[in-house]
């Protein structure tokens, strides 16, 4: 039997209630939910640092009830294109869908994964959940006298 698998991605740095809504709405569309967690290198590209180390973010996401698999992104840029390709190879018989949160609209100019999803015939769903919070809202509240404890430089 062909399984429908929803794929979501993000930094989840830190995870907040908006992410939980995004995960649940995505899971409601499928039999299985795979969450791609952006890696440390991607955090550095996006915001210069990470609030939580990647392994902690991955473990927290994996232990959520609605999440079936959590995968650390293998990409070296801000996209998760190569990780989506890897999932497609791992699950060739599954019907995959790529879901975006409420703050992202499907547009080839603002979603890095647009072209790879077209190429692999993976439908995209957008607007899942309201923009309740921004992770940067939380991480910006903490000031350090010392360098960030999670900085591995």
Give short role names for the model-derived ranges.
Residues 1-153:
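Nucleotidyltransferase catalytic core that binds NTPs
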């Amino acid at each position: 039997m062909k399984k429908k698998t929803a794929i979501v991605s993000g930094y989840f740095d830190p995870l907040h209630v908006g992410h939980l809504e995004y995960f649940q709405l995505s899971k409601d569309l499928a039999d299985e939910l795979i969450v791609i967690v952006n890696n440390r290198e991607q955090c550095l590209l996006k915001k210069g640092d990470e609030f939580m180390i990647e392994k902690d973010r991955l473990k927290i996401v994996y232990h959520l009830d609605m999440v079936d698999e959590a995968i650390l992104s293998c990409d070296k840029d801000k996209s998760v294109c190569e990780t989506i390709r890897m999932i497609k190879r791992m699950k060739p018989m599954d019907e995959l869908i790529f879901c975006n949160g409420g703050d992202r609209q499907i547009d080839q100019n603002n979603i890095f994964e647009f072209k790879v999803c077209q190429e692999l015939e993976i439908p995209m769903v957008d607007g899942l959940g309201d923009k309740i919070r921004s992770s940067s809202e939380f991480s910006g509240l903490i000031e350090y006298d010392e360098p960030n404890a999670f900085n591995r430089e």
